[in-house]
């Protein structure tokens, strides 16, 4: 899956969550600016950050990465 498609899924999961970007950033140990970059620029979270993000958002990393369509 291309990075642009991964960003779409990541943006979708973050937007549908009950958390603000600032809350997500604080919970996973990055800046709110970094969350914004994940959503809008060609920047992808490090594996450990992706893991924390998926746990917080209750979504499978396989879904974000496009390996499955199961949320």
What are these regions (language model features)?
Residues 24-25, 53:
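Short alpha-helical "recognition helix" segments of helix-turn-helix
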Residues 48-63:
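DNA major-groove recognition helix of helix-turn-helix/homeodomain DNA-binding modules
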Residues 39, 57, 65-68:
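DNA major-groove recognition helix of helix-turn-helix
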Residues 22, 33, 62:
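Key DNA-contact positions within bacterial/archaeal DNA-binding proteins
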Residues 1-19:
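A short, Lys/Arg-rich alpha-helix, primarily the initiator
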Residues 29-44:
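Recognition helix of helix-turn-helix/homeodomain-like DNA-binding domains
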Residues 1, 18, 65-71:
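Short, charged recognition helix plus adjacent turn
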């Amino acid at each position: 899956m291309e990075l642009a498609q991964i960003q779409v899924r990541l943006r979708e999961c973050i937007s549908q969550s009950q958390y603000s970007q600032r809350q997500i950033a604080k919970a996973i140990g990055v800046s709110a600016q970094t969350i914004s970059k994940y959503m809008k620029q060609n920047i992808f979270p490090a594996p450990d950050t992706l893991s924390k993000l998926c746990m917080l958002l209750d979504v499978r990393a396989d879904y974000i990465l496009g390996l499955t369509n199961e949320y």
